[in-house]
């Protein structure tokens, strides 16, 4: 199963496609650790806020240098436009604005123990946790039509959010689940 990783190169976003296992190994091995550490050191100065397209904007020159990961689908660019190659049924829950790094680690460790969790990791701020889950249609498989994919994606996001809220015993902010 492939996911899409977007890196800013100047004013362009460059798409790279990775197998989920390879991306998980890169996160676990700390291949981005230098960039993550630098981001965490200055994050409190950045005044970050989320844009409508899902990106995080900052008032810091150069912005956040971490790549953006699209877990929901495998994309490629064709004549400058994004084209979905394959929807993979992955949804990301974001547990944001935790009080401390230690609390984020605690939430990550709890999420790792739940059978629905495919992958979880700390966000760039060190005070958030990203939890990746997968859904399937009853009987297996995934929807193929764009509108069915959007509805299915929203449904699995809401189901996952509800399940994790019950396990964590606190509210997880609703963030519109995105396919890109």
State where each predicted segment sits.
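Hydrophobic, Leu/Ile/Phe/Ala-enriched alpha-helical segments that form helix-helix packing faces
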Residues: 46, 50, 55, 111-115, ...
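DNA replication initiation modules
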Residues: 3-11, 80-102, 136-180
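DNA replication initiation on ssDNA origins
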Residues: 1-89
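An amphipathic, hydrophobic-aromatic interaction surface with interspersed Lys/Arg
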Residues: 117-121
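Beta-strand-rich binding-surface signature
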Residues: 90, 114, 128
């Amino acid at each position: 199963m492939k996911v899409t990783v977007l890196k800013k190169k100047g004013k362009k976003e460059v798409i790279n496609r990775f197998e989920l296992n390879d991306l998980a190994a890169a996160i676990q091995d700390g291949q981005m650790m230098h960039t993550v550490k630098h981001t965490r050191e200055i994050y409190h100065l950045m005044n970050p806020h989320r844009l409508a397209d899902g990106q995080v904007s900052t008032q810091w020159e150069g912005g956040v240098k971490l790549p953006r990961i699209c877990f929901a689908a495998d994309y490629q660019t064709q004549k400058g436009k994004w084209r979905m190659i394959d929807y993979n049924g992955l949804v990301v829950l974001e547990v944001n604005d935790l009080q401390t790094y230690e609390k984020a680690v605690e939430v990550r460790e709890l999420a790792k123990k739940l059978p629905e969790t495919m992958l979880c990791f700390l966000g760039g701020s060190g005070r958030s946790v990203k939890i990746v889950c997968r859904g399937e249609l009853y009987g297996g498989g995934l929807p193929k039509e764009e509108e069915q994919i959007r509805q299915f994606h929203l449904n699995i996001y809401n189901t996952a959010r509800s399940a994790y809220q019950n396990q964590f015993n606190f509210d997880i902010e609703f963030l519109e689940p995105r396919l890109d």
